[in-house]
Amino acid sequence: MSAQQQKNLSESAQVDQQSVQPFPRSQKVYVQGSRPDIRVPMREISLDVTPTDFGGEINAPVTVYDTSGPYTDPNVTIDVRKGLSDVRSAWIEDRGDTEKLPGLSSEFGQRRLNDAELSAMRFAHVRNPRRARAGHNVSQMHYAKKGIITPEMEFVAIRENMKLAEAREAGLLNEQHAGHSFGASIPKEITPEFVRSEVARGRAIIPANINHVELEPMIIGRNFLVKINGNIGNSALGSSIEEEVAKLTWGIRWGSDTVMDLSTGKHIHETREWIIRNSPVPIGTVPIYQALEKVGGIAEDLTWELFRDTLIEQAEQGVDYFTIHAGVLLRYVPLTAKRVTGIVSRGGSIMAKWCLAHHKENFLYTHFEDICEIMKAYDVSFSLGDGLRPGSIADANDAAQFGELETLGELTKIAWKHDVQCMIEGPGHVPMQLIKENMDKQLECCDEAPFYTLGPLTTDIAPGYDHITSGIGAAMIGWFGCAMLCYVTPKEHLGLPNKDDVKTGIITYKIAAHAADLAKGHPGAQIRDNALSKARFEFRWEDQFNLGLDPDTARAFHDETLPKDSAKVAHFCSMCGPKFCSMKITQEVRDYAKEQRIDAVDLDAEQGMQAKAAEFKAQGSQLYQKV
């Protein structure tokens, strides 16, 4: 995008048209809570009737979790220049513990606002920020500890259940394998009280800054559905504000539960405002990235005062969680010297360099309680960064990684003392046999605070395919108890991801998260699998496509060899053809048995006898065989 186009963004910005298309045979449904303004969005997939001898068997619609916000609702007009509608202001105002500020508090925010050259690119509909009244704490954890069920908690409970009671009544929960949850306590139904208790205990967080009023609340915790995060952000090498907003809307269409804005290039402040105002999902950032930009990229010049102003700037915009690398301590840095890949975290390397340059302890660590004071005034959640995570499987589970993890556990308890919500970031690159140890160590050190991992990548030999190497580890650690998985795209280690890469990474991680939910035995997790399997056996091709995580790709693959509409009702696919389709043959056997009134058990027994007879003849009809 040219400088002139970027300059006129406030007039020209348009929503990404691909992101606002409703999914095929799907409709947006809203489940109302205890008050009219609690309207929880879900996606309902309609299914075709199964033909029978008696007119047809109705297949109940399948309800699925929906992260796309109003973008896929055809009844909503989207204008990214105005942002999304307000969801939460009434809830926040009703609590009576916040105040509207006359303007921005941060010095940097004020300077950007007064810079006339930025006026055309600036988001035009900025509200005055809100902050806790003096002496008040406005975090969801604070309310939860006081026994208060907030509208956000009720919203989350309804959302996690996905009409579970209706599914149970319809008998859709009868066919699900028992899971193994490794100590997680997943109830048969998620209630608002259960949400409150998990947030109060620190086992779950609801990232929901009071200045992100467009947010549709969600929850991150091991006793809830496994979530995924997608990363976006510009850099000095390119990408525009409009492209980043398009990546946001594209990512949440395919299932990104949260989005991190990792921008490091120009106009970080303006980019973030556009993203938050158009985001129905929580937005996370790494504030040290912007702080570094403010000092010209020289880590040694960072100061606590500058960083504090950056936290306030971002909190007043509405960032829901901050990655803070407060566990990178001076004494841990030498432990990385003999690593194959050293320190690979950007935030970790920045703070390590600062510590060595000044030979002082990490100022994020020494000022941690000061940071807590800011967080609880806006309800920003901690995502305690793993600045010493392994960047290769050779470095996995070493002294530096686990030393930092122990420190993150100490910091978690300090955050909880201030009633600040907190999750813990994890690796990284870990071979499969060491993944369980990571999860167990985190649960032990951090007292079950939610774990949030990047993968982990299980091997280092597949550049271009690291969405797969990491998807393997993500599924495993999600099963073991990890609450949120940060996606990896095919471009990992190679370049900045484009829209296609974002989609590939998200779909890969939706598979991993869902596989983990199945393995944990999350109630209702298997409903969609069962519906798709039934559609596959009955050759309901459109239902197969629409029930999948990516209907577009499934339909395109089918149409590569069978493009005609008539193929959408064919009782075979292009892999086996009409004569060798196992499911078609099975249906014919069933039909034959029905016509001949042969019991299925008898038919199976007869087929087994015939198979054994053929095996006996093939071995030479000898009564005894040599061994």
From Swiss-Prot:
Gene3D superfamilies: 6.10.250.620, Radical SAM ThiC family, central domain. It holds the Pfam family ThiC-associated. GO terms for molecular function: 4 iron, 4 sulfur cluster binding; carbon-carbon lyase activity; zinc ion binding. It catalyses: 5-amino-1-(5-phospho-beta-D-ribosyl)imidazole + S-adenosyl-L-methionine = 4-amino-2-methyl-5-(phosphooxymethyl)pyrimidine + CO + 5'-deoxyadenosine + formate + L-methionine + 3 H(+). [4Fe-4S] cluster binds at C573, C576, C581. InterPro entries: ThiC, ThiC-associated_dom, ThiC/Bza_core_dom, ThiC/BzaA/B. It is an enzyme of class 4 (lyase). Substrate binds at N231, M260, Y289, H325, S345, R346, G347, D386, G387, L388, R389, E425, Y452. Residues 1-32 are annotated as: Disordered. One of its GO terms (biological process) is thiamine biosynthetic process. The keyword Metal-binding applies. GO terms for cellular component: cytosol. Zn(2+) binds at H429, H493. Keywords: 4Fe-4S, Iron, Iron-sulfur, Lyase, Metal-binding, S-adenosyl-L-methionine, Thiamine biosynthesis, Zinc. Pathway: Cofactor biosynthesis; thiamine diphosphate biosynthesis. Its EC number is 4.1.99.17. Its cofactor is [4Fe-4S] cluster. Belongs to the ThiC family. Catalyzes the synthesis of the hydroxymethylpyrimidine phosphate (HMP-P) moiety of thiamine from aminoimidazole ribotide (AIR) in a radical S-adenosyl-L-methionine (SAM)-dependent reaction. HAMAP family: ThiC (MF_00089). This is Phosphomethylpyrimidine synthase. It comes from Ectopseudomonas mendocina (strain ymp). The lineage of its organism: Bacteria, Pseudomonadati, Pseudomonadota, Gammaproteobacteria, Pseudomonadales. The gene is thiC.
